[in-house]
């Protein structure tokens, strides 16, 4: 077993900093409800504080015995406490992680890799969100480890403002992305300007 655990750690990128550990998930971790103020973004009519971002996102899951979304969701519930990137763009990062993990993974050795490359429309509430022209290069590794199981989560997100027409970032409330955003406590509010839009509060 110790030999296997040494092999497992080879599927992670070497890093001098020890990634944060997350505690074990509770048994009822699969119970969830979307945040009550969340409204799916459908068609934007208001233009205030709206920005298009060209996004490259990657979430790499490393686990020798497969993994369940119950554990991934449990890890992401601690995201606010362990996030190490630009806090003016934490809402954008949460959206990208949710969308990436909603796609199909590509196996890569002991890893499963989820990728997202898309232009997305974001709207922030007044005085929230990134500065004008601000870009993001975010990379972090998070691990969950106990005597029986190890999961490494490597997250990379790059974002730059661009003029390509963006897409909506939520299609229906029952999607896996919305479930993950609920887990990560994505902070939003309904737009006063457009009842079909959600403004990011982070």
UniProtKB/Swiss-Prot annotation:
UniProt keywords, alphabetically: Host membrane, Host-virus interaction, Membrane, Phosphoprotein, Viral budding, Viral budding via the host ESCRT complexes, Viral envelope protein, Viral matrix protein, Viral release from host cell, Virion
Molecular-function annotations in GO: structural constituent of virion
Residue pairs linked by disulfide bridges in the UniProt entry: none
Placement of sequence motif PPXY motif: 45-48
Keyword hit for Phosphoprotein: yes
A GO cellular component annotation in the UniProt record: host cell endomembrane system
Domain of life: Viruses
First-listed, main subcellular location of the protein, grouped into a coarse class: virion
Subcellular compartments: Virion membrane; Host endomembrane system
Alphabetized InterPro entries for the sequence: Rhabdo_M, Rhabdovirus_M_sf
Keyword Phosphoprotein listed: yes
An annotated GO BP: viral budding via host ESCRT complex
Membrane topology: Peripheral membrane protein
Stretch list, region Essential for glycoprotein binding: 125-161
Subunit structure: Homomultimer. Interacts with nucleoprotein and with the cytoplasmic domain of glycoprotein.
Comment field (misc): Most abundant protein in the virion.
Similarity remark: Belongs to the lyssavirus matrix protein family.
Biological function: Plays a major role in assembly and budding of virion. Completely covers the ribonucleoprotein coil and keep it in condensed bullet-shaped form. Inhibits viral transcription and stimulates replication. Plays a major role in early induction of TRAIL-mediated apoptosis in infected neurons.
Recorded domain comment: Late-budding domains (L domains) are short sequence motifs essential for viral particle budding. They recruit proteins of the host ESCRT machinery (Endosomal Sorting Complex Required for Transport) or ESCRT-associated proteins. Matrix protein contains one L domain: a PPXY motif which potentially interacts with the WW domain 3 of NEDD4 E3 ubiquitin ligase (Potential).
Protein name: Matrix protein
Originating organism: Australian bat lyssavirus (isolate Human/AUS/1998)
Gene that this sequence comes from: M
């Amino acid at each position: 077993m110790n030999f296997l655990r040494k092999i497992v750690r080879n599927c992670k990128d070497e890093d001098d900093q020890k990634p944060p550990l997350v505690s074990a998930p509770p048994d009822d971790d699969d119970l969830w409800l979307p945040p009550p103020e969340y409204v799916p973004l459908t068609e934007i009519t208001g233009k205030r504080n709206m920005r298009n971002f060209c996004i490259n996102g990657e979430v790499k899951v490393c686990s020798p015995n497969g993994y369940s979304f119950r554990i991934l969701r449990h890890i992401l519930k601690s995201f606010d406490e362990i996030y190490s990137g630009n806090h003016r763009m934490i809402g954008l990062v949460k959206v990208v992680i949710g969308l990436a993990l909603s796609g199909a993974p590509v196996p890569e050795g002991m890893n499963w890799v989820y990728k997202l490359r898309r232009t997305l429309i974001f709207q922030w509430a007044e005085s929230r969100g990134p500065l004008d022209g601000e870009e993001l290069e975010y990379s972090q590794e998070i691990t969950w480890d106990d005597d029986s199981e190890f999961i490494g989560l490597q997250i990379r997100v790059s974002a730059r403002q661009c003029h390509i027409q963006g897409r909506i970032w939520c299609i229906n409330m029952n999607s896996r992305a919305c479930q993950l955003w609920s887990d990560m406590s994505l902070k939003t509010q309904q737009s006063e300007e457009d009842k079909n839009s959600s403004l990011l509060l982070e």
